[in-house]
């Protein structure tokens, strides 16, 4: 025996329509905007009047509007339910006039509160005052765990700087293992709760990295930092591969970029006592190289292969041979093609695969741009040396790098990459101004007035550029000039950085 089918009817509202000396009862849907059926209603009303021998509606259907019986206009963009129209109400069809639309008024507080609650909860929840749910409780618990992890990290690093005991590393590692177990339980039991898995995973990665850095004996130095950074990189990649979320991929890429740069600096410091300024110069040059390589790295991470050249018959025209580079192809002759390979095959990627690859490429580019922008202010801070013999050259290197970062933003079509680069460059400018202000003698003019004027002028220039550039269509000569200025800045940057870092002096001696 089959269960009876359930039929759902839309909410309706029976009202009286008054026009001139005529009155007609009609039933309208109460849950959709009046605009959807208003003109049809006027046409049907006109046809009904003419069928009964009366004069029809004088004006076209779009020249009328609905009023309440007290003369207040109704907004046809809302439904009858939202307007507070109930069964038996009388509405007046009148020519359209200028004025404000009607907002429903309630004679009692309870009726108004009930109507407001119904409107707020029509999409399944209160959109103004969100209640405490299980998701809220879970996120609050993760925040509490993060606070506890922060306390453990601070105490672990403090204790490790005092003593060479393995207890701090064991304590941080033990708590990190517990968080790893929690992440695995969430992964196996609640696979859809990626938020909890990410929370447990990132906290575990931080704790395990600190434990690995504190485990080797000796005073904390570059070697310990290198070990911890490598653990962070491996843990971040693991989380990114497990979650496969777009925003998670961007975060993982940013973390890997920052930690990779810091790990390279730590590796150099392990073997050579390189000065901070030389390391900062190398980092600035490396950041520019990373920005230029961002599209290539993103395509490599997304495994987007070089284009495939084929004919409309399905036979390959070009193919890669054994021993050839991955980005090169060679012509295919008839003797190389087998008969069974001559079938018509569609080798074009499907739209879903192309969209997934595009999202992954975009996420990787966003992460790399954000990571590079986070490192740029620190690198500029390390390059600048106020009141030193080569201070002007350091200022030139930092200024050229910041300018190249700003111009590189126009090479990205998505907004997040460009915004990240521009914000990183602006933060670098503020960091440079702050370093010069802190290094000058304590005084109102040099320590506050001139830095504040410079920062205000830079902000005003940024505002002017933001207002003019997006709304202006520049001529090709202007765009070509900007490109040539960018090339000249790159040409001037490399010798200046080499001279500032002592490369020419090292080669001469």
From Swiss-Prot:
It is a multi-pass membrane protein. The keyword Ion transport does not apply. Pfam families: EccD, YukD. Keywords: Cell membrane, Membrane, Transmembrane, Transmembrane helix. One of its GO terms (cellular component) is plasma membrane. The keyword Transmembrane applies. It is found in: Cell membrane. The chain crosses the membrane at residues 135-155, 170-190, 196-216, 222-242, 248-268, 281-301, 364-384, 389-409, 418-438, 449-469, 487-507. NCBIfam families: T7SS_EccD. Belongs to the EccD/Snm4 family. Part of the ESX-2 / type VII secretion system (T7SS), which is composed of cytosolic and membrane components. This is ESX-2 secretion system protein eccD2. It comes from Mycobacterium tuberculosis (strain CDC 1551 / Oshkosh). The gene is eccD2.
